[in-house]
């Protein structure tokens, strides 16, 4: 039996359902704050899942409009019920259905590394961001592994090279220590998250990097 195609993987059993039911909002907000000011901006939650970032951008950040885009239907349906004031769009991150220079702020939290064509996805991110606009991308360190069918991983230096090659200025770099250790009750996953948290005490081994990008 062949492996499921990426969209089939997410549609058949949306494995982030626990994120919809028990979101780690402080973790998302820590990243969103790197894009402040959000008030009055047009905001895109790229690879949104159920769109908690779009919700926070609107309700806490004061964004004028927030769009949540994902290529799987199920998370969009879940998110639409929770945050009806956001715009919900089903689309592909490598061919974004938006005009050039549409958004002031973009968040891609754990999404661009799953694009089938990373350079094309970054070119699209650059295209839809306004001049002077900012994006925060949260991407995995070189050793991180998940069960998702497509996943690009790199060191911090490699990520910096890739992002600059796409035309972005790097305005800041931070780290993300990953999901809460007791996010769920699966013993193996708890042990893995505990190990990741310990590894993250060593700066080069932080779980994920947070790059704040600016379009010149």
Where in the sequence are the language-model features?
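Conserved beta-strand signature within the Rossmann-like core of class I S-adenosyl-L-methionine
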Residues: 133-139
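A short glycine-rich, Lys/Arg-flanked "PGG" loop and its adjoining helix->strand segment in the class I
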Residues: 119-131
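Conserved class I S-adenosyl-L-methionine
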Residues: 1-36, 41-49, 195
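Class I SAM-dependent methyltransferase SAM/SAH-binding core
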Residues: 50-95
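A conserved beta-strand element that flanks and buttresses the S-adenosyl-L-methionine
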Residues: 107
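Acceptor-substrate binding/catalytic loop of class I
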Residues: 143-158
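A C-terminal cap/extension of S-adenosyl-L-methionine-dependent methyltransferases
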Residues: 136, 157, 161, 171-216
């Amino acid at each position: 039996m062949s492996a499921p195609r990426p969209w089939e993987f997410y549609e058949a059993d949306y494995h982030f359902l626990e994120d919809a039911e028990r979101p780690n909002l402080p973790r998302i907000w820590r990243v969103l704050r790197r894009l402040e000011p959000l008030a009055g901006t047009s905001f895109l939650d790229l690879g949104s899942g159920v769109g908690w970032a779009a919700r926070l951008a609107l309700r806490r950040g004061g964004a004028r409009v927030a769009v949540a885009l994902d290529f799987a239907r199920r998370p969009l349906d879940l998110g639409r019920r929770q945050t009806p004031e956001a715009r919900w769009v089903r689309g592909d991150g490598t061919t974004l259905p938006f005009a050039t220079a549409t958004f002031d702020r973009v968040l891609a939290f754990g999404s661009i590394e799953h694009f089938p064509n990373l350079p094309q996805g970054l070119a699209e991110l650059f295209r839809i961001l306004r001049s002077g606009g900012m994006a925060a991308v949260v991407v995995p360190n070189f050793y991180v592994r998940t069960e998702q069918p497509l996943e690009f991983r790199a060191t911090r230096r490699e990520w910096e090279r890739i992002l600059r090659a796409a035309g972005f200025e790097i305005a800041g770099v931070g780290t993300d220590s990953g999901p809460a250790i007791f996010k769920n009750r699966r013993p193996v996953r708890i042990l893995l998250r505990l190990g990741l948290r310990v590894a993250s005490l060593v700066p080069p081994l932080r779980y994920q990097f947070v790059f704040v990008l600016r379009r010149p």
